[in-house]
């Protein structure tokens, strides 16, 4: 369940509405003739709204389903039941081709800046991959876009030729942010984006996210367990328990 802290954030229209969202993971026994003997209730009947241009903080204890909720919104996993309405479209009901097109509108910044980047790819290829997948830019245009994104997140264009292991944790998270921005999304799920970073670096990344939100008119769902961080960045807070 969630409890939303009410706070005035203006009269912005709703971009995302989650209604009665449920995700149960089945527990099975047996190998050849397996059968379901129970279920883990990862997300159990949650509802909330997110308005355009705001940051909704999503907090709760470990294991309460925060990260699962983020992945359900992006349809990285399928819900058991419930509605996820993004800009008037019910995500669980969309066919695959429409969902693929909609993915440009919604991106995610992962918690682990070390594990979320392919160590065999250069930074330029990592950031440019979404542009290739969604056929947004190729060749010289793609390289130009990658350079622009690197500079936007506080890195340099020459970093495009380097590999992830050559960067610090904070720099890697900036690369992850640049990758999320590549397709010009409207909604970004920030899945504990600073929890793996040193305290001295956390503030820099938070400030960067706030600056990018203003520059690109972004909407965030900021998932975290640190209430101080959530209070600093969020317009409203939803508590999962």
What are these regions (language model features)?
Residues 32-36, 91-107, 133, 139-140:
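ABC ATPase NBD coupling module
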Residues 82-90:
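Conserved ABC transporter NBD signature motif
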Residues 90, 141-158:
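Conserved ABC ATPase "signature" region
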Residues 163-167, 171:
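Conserved ABC ATPase signature
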Residues 165, 183, 207:
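Conserved signature/switch motifs of ABC ATPase nucleotide-binding domains
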Residues 177, 205:
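Hydrophobic anchor residue at the start of the ABC signature
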Residues 182-186, 202:
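A short, proline-enriched helix->beta-strand linker immediately N-terminal to the Walker B motif
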């Amino acid at each position: 369940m969630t409890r939303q802290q009410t706070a005035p954030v203006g009269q912005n229209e709703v971009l995302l509405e989650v209604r009665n969202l449920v995700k149960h993971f089945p527990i099975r026994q047996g190998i050849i003739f397996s059968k379901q003997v129970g279920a883990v209730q990862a997300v159990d009947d949650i509802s909330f709204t997110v308005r355009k241009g705001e940051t909704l903080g999503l907090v709760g204890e470990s294991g309460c389903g925060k990260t699962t909720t983020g992945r359900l919104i992006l349809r990285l996993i399928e819900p058991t039941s419930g509605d996820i309405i993004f800009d008037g479209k019910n995500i669980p009901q969309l066919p695959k081709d429409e969902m693929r097109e909609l993915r440009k509108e919604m991106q995610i910044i992962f918690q682990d800046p070390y594990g979320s980047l392919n160590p065999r790819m250069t930074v330029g290829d990592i950031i440019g991959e979404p542009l290739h997948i969604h056929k947004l830019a190729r060749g010289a245009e793609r390289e130009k876009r990658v350079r622009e994104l690197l500079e936007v997140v506080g890195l340099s264009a020459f970093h495009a030729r380097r590999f992830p292991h050559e960067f610090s944790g904070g720099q890697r998270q900036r690369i992850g942010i640049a990758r999320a921005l590549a397709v010009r999304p409207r909604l970004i799920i920030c899945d504990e984006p600073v929890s793996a970073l040193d305290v001295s670096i956390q503030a820099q990344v938070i400030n960067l996210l706030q600056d990018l939100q203003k520059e690109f008119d972004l909407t965030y769902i900021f998932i975290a367990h640190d209430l101080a961080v959530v209070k600093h960045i969020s317009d409203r807070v939803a508590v999962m328990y």
